[in-house]
From Swiss-Prot:
The modification N6-acetyllysine is found at K16. Belongs to the globin family. GO terms for molecular function: haptoglobin binding; heme binding; iron ion binding; organic acid binding; oxygen binding; oxygen carrier activity; peroxidase activity. GO terms for biological process: hydrogen peroxide catabolic process. Keywords: Acetylation, Heme, Iron, Metal-binding, Oxygen transport, Phosphoprotein, Transport. This is Hemoglobin subunit alpha. Gene3D superfamilies: Globins (1.10.490.10). It comes from Lama glama. The modification N6-succinyllysine is found at K7, K11, K16, K40. The lineage of its organism: Eukaryota, Metazoa, Chordata, Craniata, Vertebrata. The modification Phosphotyrosine is found at Y24.
Amino acid sequence: VLSSKDKANIKTAFGKIGGHAADYGAEALERMFLGFPTTKTYFPHFDLSHGSAQVKAHGKKVGDALTKAADHLDDLPSALSALSDLHAHKLRVDPVNFKLLSHCLLVTVAAHHPGDFTPAVDASLDKFLANVSTVLTSKYR
């Protein structure tokens, strides 16, 4: 459960992320592909090289989805329902991969905003990403 302080930290962080969400999403995907190469199996049709248009486009989708989620902290299931259906029924992404991408997203945000990435912000964003992951995997049954 996100506390009021967590929600404030998330809103503040996404305010700073601002128009960089797509770039950060792509960077986090690149980090994930490099650090956890087994995740590449879900993207066999992608050019996974640094700066590829496909990774950038998917990074934009990730960034847009997280921005939408950050704007709907009190109703993540509704905000992410279509995305949850897609990942559960069509893409069938192993749920562990959401945790890996979440880690890479945290590293990316920390790298770009080191002065703002306090332990409290880290904890709040980690809880937020865990909640998003839970929603995305909720329809796997």
